Amino acid sequence: SREELIISEIKKNPGIRFREVMEKISLSNGVLSYYVRKLENNGVIRTQRTTRVSRFFINDMTEEESKVVSRLRQTTPKAILVTLLENDRLEFQEIVANVGKASATVSFYLTKLVNDEIVSYKKVDLKKNYFVVEKKRIANLITEYHPDVVENASDNLADIMSSL
């Protein structure tokens, strides 16, 4: 059924956007809207709405996990998290160098990761050293929902994941 197709797609890709679901299972906007509303009302799925994006999750995922998975679907936050998992604590400029994006871009997403309580920092000699708050949980979510990250990452990250 269409409902099962939608649920299956959201399970495989938590944090998937409306348009992505529409394209992957070839449903029109109106038809998908109808089923999304129905599944939400029945408590099967949850929608995380921001000003520009709606993301869908199966209801068994916690709010915290949803935040992490949403960030992992974005290139720069994913790169920041992988960098911080590979290197225990880094200063801002070190993150910028590793991620390879403009400092303003890294700053924008790093602030979001800190606000989401996924990343934190400690001040050392007037500089902030950033780190992943719950390494094991983040590593597990990456392994479960983004195995490509582990496959494409350095051996260092693979070693870290297996040691946690």
Describe each PLM feature range.
Residues 1-3, 17, 48-75, 124-146:
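Short, cationic-aromatic polyanion-contact patches
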Residues 1-12, 79-83, 103, 112-164:
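Long, low-complexity, charge-rich intrinsically disordered regions
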Residues 13-17, 87-91:
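Short capping segments at the starts of secondary-structure elements
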Residues 17-61:
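Acidic (E/D-rich), amphipathic helical modules within compact regulatory domains
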Residues 20-24, 94-99:
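A short acidic, leucine-rich amphipathic alpha-helix
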Residues 27-38, 100-114:
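Short amphipathic alpha-helical interaction segments
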Residues 89-95, 101, 105:
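Extended, charged alpha-helical interaction scaffolds
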